[in-house]
Amino acid sequence: MNFSSAIPTEYEQLAINIEQEFGRLDGILHSAGILGDLTPLEMYDPNTWDEVMKVNLRAPFMLTQHLLPLLKRAPEASVIFMSSSVGHKARAFWGAYAVAKAGIENLTVLFADELANTSKVRVNCINPQGTRTAMRAKAYPAEDPSNVPTAEQIMPLFL
C-alpha cells in the first residue's frame, strides 16, 4: 500500500483481506515514515509537507482505525506507534517530520485513553532513538553509521 496516496477504500480492503485470511489481528507496528525536507518552514514545499503528513500521521491513524475491529478480536492485541525526539522537543528545520511525530504522540494518548476501559488492545508509543536507516543517514550525513544501532538491535524494545 502506498501511504502517500492511499484512500479510505484501500484501508477498508486491507482490513477485509486480513479478516478473510486470519480472522483477527494481534498487533500493528507503525514504523513506516519519511523525513521530508530539513529546511526552514518559510521555505517548506507544501506538497512535501502533505506527503510527510500522509505517510507519518494519516496512515497510522487510518490503519489503526480500520484495523481496530480485528485487533479487538485478539486476546491481547497491541498497537505500537513510533516517535522521535523531535516529536516532543521540536528542532529548527525538522518541519513536517517533527509536527507529524508530535501528532503521533498525541494520537497514541487518544487511542490509549479511548480503548483503556473498552477493550484489551494496548496502545503505546516508542522512541527507539537513532536507528541505522537510510532516513537517518539523510538526516545526519556526517554521522558514523557504525555508532548507530541497526533495526535488528533495537527490536527487543518492541517485543
State what each model feature region is:
Residues 1-8:
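Rossmann-fold cofactor-recognition segment
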Residues 14, 39-41, 45-50:
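Substrate-binding pocket helix/loop in short-chain dehydrogenase/reductase
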Residues 26-27, 50, 76-82, 121-124:
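Conserved catalytic-site loops of classical short-chain dehydrogenases/reductases
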Residues 31-37:
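Conserved NAD(P)H cofactor-binding loop of Rossmann-fold oxidoreductase domains
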Residues 34, 72, 76-117, 130:
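Catalytic loop of short-chain dehydrogenase/reductase
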Residues 64-65, 109:
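A short, exposed helix-loop element centered on a Lys and neighboring polar residues
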Residues 121, 125-126, 133, 142-159:
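C-terminal helical subdomain
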